[in-house]
């Protein structure tokens, strides 16, 4: 089976599948950053604006810029009621359209492993942040089973079914993140693992939500019904429902921050 590149073209589907997870992690991440109010922020790879909205709600920023290569995601983000002060535009994480030392804080939420050259992406965040400002990111721990789609991808691997990975997937490793930050010349670098839980009303919700993932959707669409049924049964066995029929599981992200 040929693998299609992971594409983010549906802001609504992404909100249902990943937006909830993103905000669960994002809340803990922002508390860890402990930023001052009234700052200038840039959220690189803002996607559909889920994390940008959290910056607006929790950090009382003076300015927020959101950059993403997907026009569809930018359109969705621009219509978020909770992020109306933010300015969203399409752009390249490796060539940010801003002047040196302009921002107080730069973030990448679940993005760095999608940047073709992560080192250049970190260098660009550092370039546009003032001395003393913060450069921070978090990424699902792909190799440690921390990705929200892990219930299904684990069974795909067990069945020898291939699925696409982010182009710079090694950047999800904590040791790689640390090296990227240190090699960029950032100071006072700190790391932590952020673990969150999500509860699904039933198995059908768990499956249909994860099936919206741009990683899984094109793969599942090409599988015969018999294989889909076998995968579903395997996931049910791995994640049994509670007495109410609900299923709860955790995901975790590797987080890092440093000062310019």
Sequence positions of predicted segments:
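Conserved Class I S-adenosyl-L-methionine
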Residues: 3-8, 48-50, 169-260
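Class I SAM-dependent methyltransferase Rossmann-like catalytic core
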Residues: 8-20
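Conserved alpha-helix/loop element of class I SAM-dependent methyltransferases that forms part
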Residues: 20-39, 54, 58
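Short, well-ordered alpha-helices that flank and scaffold nucleotide-derived cofactor binding pockets
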Residues: 31, 53, 57, 79, ...
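Class I SAM-dependent methyltransferase SAM/SAH-binding core
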Residues: 40-96, 120
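A short acidic, Gly/Pro-enriched loop at the edge of an enzyme's catalytic core
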Residues: 94-106
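A short SAM/SAH-binding and catalytic strip from SAM-dependent methyltransferases
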Residues: 104-118, 141
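Conserved catalytic/acceptor-binding region of the Class I
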Residues: 119-120, 126, 130-201, 217-220
